[in-house]
């Protein structure tokens, strides 16, 4: 009986470890205009972001990255540069911005803007583990 109980505890503790969650998780809080980046369940970075300004929308939910580009230019907004883009839902992406003074308040057309250095760091973290092992979670 003790052997069965020990095996059951070991079995269930294995499935509750961070190995079964995303290796990299970017959690964006729209009300705080903040991103927290977790690596294997541990907080690694806290960064200011800019999300959708009035009249635009940043979606809420959880996704995996779908496409990644070191250099990308918006097809919708005047060929604007979007360095280190991580697309997660249609045309919505996390990317670097030249408008660093607006970080910490809503300013975008819906994407999540980061300081260019932070966008590069996140991009490289996701690239290292692969998009299938990363998660983007956006909450209000």
Q: Which sequence ranges carry the predicted segments?
A:
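Exported/periplasmic cell-wall-interacting domains
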Residues: 21-23, 53-62, 69-140
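Bacterial N-terminal signal peptides
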Residues: 6-14
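Active-site-proximal flexible loops/turns
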Residues: 9, 36, 74
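General beta-strand recognition
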Residues: 34-36, 64, 93
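A structural motif detector for short, solvent-exposed N-terminal "entry" segments of globular domains
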Residues: 20-54
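N-terminal signal peptide c-region/cleavage motif recognized by signal peptidases
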Residues: 16-18
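Positively charged n-region of N-terminal signal peptides that target proteins for export
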Residues: 1-4
């Amino acid at each position: 009986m003790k052997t069965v109980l020990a095996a059951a505890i070991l079995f269930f503790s294995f499935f509750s470890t961070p190995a079964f969650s995303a290796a990299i998780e970017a959690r964006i809080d729209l009300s705080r205009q903040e991103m927290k980046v977790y690596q294997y369940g541990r907080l690694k970075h806290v960064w200011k972001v800019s999300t959708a300004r009035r009249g635009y929308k940043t979606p809420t939910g959880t996704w995996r990255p779908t496409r990644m580009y070191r250099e990308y230019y918006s097809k919708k907004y005047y060929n604007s540069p979007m360095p280190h883009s991580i697309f997660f839902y249609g045309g919505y992406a996390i990317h670097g911005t030249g408008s660093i003074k607006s970080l910490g308040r809503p300013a975008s057309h819906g994407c999540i803007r980061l300081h260019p250095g932070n966008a590069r760091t996140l991009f490289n973290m996701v690239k290292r583990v692969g998009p299938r092992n990363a998660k983007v979670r956006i909450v209000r």
